[in-house]
């Protein structure tokens, strides 16, 4: 789904910035370029964006910017993939209850949960349902679906 690099703006290094763009933007683009002729008509491609591309934060500039690029990619590829009959969308997950998030201190988790209208992290199964919907729904194309439980609306 991508990589992240946490550094202040002043400490950001070009090599890490480029690594983020390679992993989060360049790799999906050129992988899709190699596969597009093998994808059956009517199929859908779903990229993984992020809530951090929608709601800016101060933890990782490169992550937010590259995931914003993924959202733009899903929208812009619509025209390029139309001749192949392939749809393209993206999911922008919020905070998903993964092993990585479970290692966060309880106070940090409570702070995040306090900003989510539903008051909890998304389960992996819940976010998987969003991906499944985008794959199965033959009319969804060029969408970025934010699955964040109402982050910042509480």
What are the residue ranges of the model-derived segments?
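Active-site helix of classical SDR
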Residues: 32, 66, 74
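C-terminal substrate-recognition "lid" of short-chain dehydrogenase/reductases
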Residues: 38, 120-147, 152
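Conserved NAD(P)H cofactor-binding loop of Rossmann-fold oxidoreductase domains
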Residues: 1-5, 149-150
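Short, small/polar-rich loop/turn modules that mediate ligand/substrate recognition or access, typified
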Residues: 82, 87, 141-142
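Residue(s) in the substrate-gating loop at a strand-loop-helix junction
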Residues: 50
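Substrate-binding pocket helix/loop in short-chain dehydrogenase/reductase
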Residues: 8-9, 16-21, 101, 108, ...
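Alpha-helical segment proximal to the catalytic Tyr-Lys
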Residues: 37, 79-83
């Amino acid at each position: 789904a991508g990589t992240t690099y946490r550094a202040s703006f002043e400490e950001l290094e070009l090599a890490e910035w480029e690594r983020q763009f390679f992993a989060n933007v360049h790799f999906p683009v050129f992988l899709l370029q190699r596969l597009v002729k093998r994808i059956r008509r009517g199929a859908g491609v779903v990229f993984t964006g992020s809530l951090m591309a929608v709601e800016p934060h101060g933890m990782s500039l490169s992550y937010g910017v590259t995931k914003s690029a993924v959202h733009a990619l899903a929208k812009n590829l619509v025209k390029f993939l139309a001749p192949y009959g392939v749809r393209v969308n993206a999911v922008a997950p919020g905070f998903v209850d993964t092993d990585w998030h479970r290692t966060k201190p309880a106070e940090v988790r409570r702070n995040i949960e306090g900003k989510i209208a539903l008051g909890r992290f998304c389960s992996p199964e819940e976010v998987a349902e969003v991906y499944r919907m985008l794959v199965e729904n033959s009319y969804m194309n060029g969408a970025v679906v934010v699955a964040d439980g109402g982050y910042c609306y509480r």
